[in-house]
């Protein structure tokens, strides 16, 4: 029996597609195709091939607006991680490369550092789905006698951390809640990456490309760890005594860089004002390489952010009201990011601080450093337990 007309058309179309080199399309036609894509596919288009990337650079760019990673769940661990694009008011589900019941710990450009309830860590590119699995925490940890063992009783604690004679029961809440801090850095071109995360304020684990295990150095600081940032092969550690230490990871083994640390032995001295309640402290490295200490406080019913910067002449931390004309802050991100030239809505602009802690009022918004006002983002169509800012194409 001969082929039907529909079958013949389908076969002919398939042959045309196979014989046509889509990378050699006329640039004007390709530009129109790329500019018509959804925001997510628009960012994906630049990695198709070098020809597409060359055309992509000439396209009308989308606004530099942060997206949101959102979780539709009742608990800390979610089986439904989704991506929200505010420009199109669109939610992307079923993201490639993301495991069920895993949670975002840190981000770097289009990449996320993820961990699940089994303490399996991995890095994933949300736009391409490319994934890099990291060593399991149950494996041997270099430089320490600490080890993680799965608990037989999952009520409240899923893992136990043994450190010499001590043991600490670990619940999912303790690993994934907002009190934890982590940092991710990845080079899109070379694939080099660095990961660090803090557990229980006294355990700092690091891993970089080429390592066969996690590393821990308990002698880095006697006080506890508060926050981390990473730039130019150096890990910046902000401890509970308000000191900043810098460790160089450019060699085989990390070493403290005291000579090139302008913040050495210069702790932040902050006295709370009347009625102020200090909620959290974070650090962020500017594009100039200078470190900012950011305090989030609440006074009455208002959320406020105080930013401190080192005055190198006076050798002391001073509060500032500006961070530059083209930079903004994602609270907890570790680095300042490029800001849009003008206000694009939701208060996102130079000198703004995007923050989120849970997804209910008044715990998320955009703080204007110049005016002290907070803009609330539009609510989602779904009830969400958690959300985080995501910066596609900003890296």
From Swiss-Prot:
Every F-box domain range: 19-70
Gene3D superfamilies in alphabetical order: 1.20.1280.50
SUPFAM superfamilies: F-box domain (SSF81383)
Superkingdom to which the source organism belongs: Eukaryota
Keyword Isomerase: no
Keywords: Repeat
Alphabetized PANTHER family for the sequence: F-BOX ONLY PROTEIN (DUF295)-RELATED, OS07G0183000 PROTEIN-RELATED
Protein name: F-box only protein 7
Gene name for this UniProt entry: FBX7
